[in-house]
Amino acid sequence: APLQPYTLMADTTARNDAATAAFEPLWLPFDHPLWIVYSSGTTGLPKPIVHGHGGTVIVAMALKTLHNDVGCSYKPNNFGERYHWYSSTGWVMWNAQMSGLLNGTTCCIYDGNPGGSKDKPDWTTLWRFGAELGVTFFGAGAAFFANCLKAGVDLSTMPGLKTVRALGTTGSPLSADAQNWGTSEFEKLGVHDIWWCNISGGTDFAGAFIGGNRELPLVPGEMQCRLLGCAVEAWNEQGEPVINE
């Protein structure tokens, strides 16, 4: 069944030439506060964290453009890639999704429960949304993909998902079984080179330190590389790095 009507941001923010020419941006310092995000509360009460304009833009451009491989478009004469990463407004992934606008990506935002209702669970809801809008990058928490596997979701019934070329996960470890399920489902749709961008990051800097790289091979249930500018190491019990082990 069709989902609720959606609104394109281009329709709500359209300006005529005169209004656009008259707009004057307000120039601010590099570290001027942009937004406040809150920690999860796992280790106590949620803590407010203020992020500045400059640092947020630098981190977001490196993550979205280089490691998530999203941008204006791979095809001429269209409105750019369609980027969706399901998130509530209370999770930093909402802010991360919005930063896709920095490099010309069209953000597709879903308002609702990705698993249907409590009385009528439906783990195809978000997939149908992606199929309707022709999403090219589809991201969600790793738990979402695990629930789809558990529910036996069949993506072959949604041919509109053929536009998807990348899947993103974060929030918790993605199991190899869940990743293999997703890869197999997209192969049924004729998408034989689906790329998984599994990332790990933090609210404290509104970014990721481990993520994806289109030039590296995929290992189900694993992340591909440390991100640019991030000093990331895995240590043994003696506090020694275990490079290449």
Model-identified regions with their sequence ranges:
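Short Gly/Pro-enriched turn/cap motifs at secondary-structure boundaries
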Residues: 25-28, 220-226
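ANL superfamily adenylate-forming
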Residues: 1-30, 151-152, 194, 207
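Conserved AMP-binding A3 loop
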Residues: 25-27, 34-58
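Gly/Ser/Thr-rich phosphate-binding loop
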Residues: 105, 135-140, 149-220, 231-233, ...
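Conserved S/T- and glycine-rich ATP-binding loop of Class I adenylate-forming
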Residues: 33, 39-42, 64, 83, ...
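Conserved AMP-binding/adenylation subdomain of ANL enzymes
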Residues: 55-82, 89-136, 151-152
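Short beta-strand->loop structural element characteristic of the AMP-binding/adenylate-forming
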Residues: 1-3, 12, 47-50, 106-118, ...
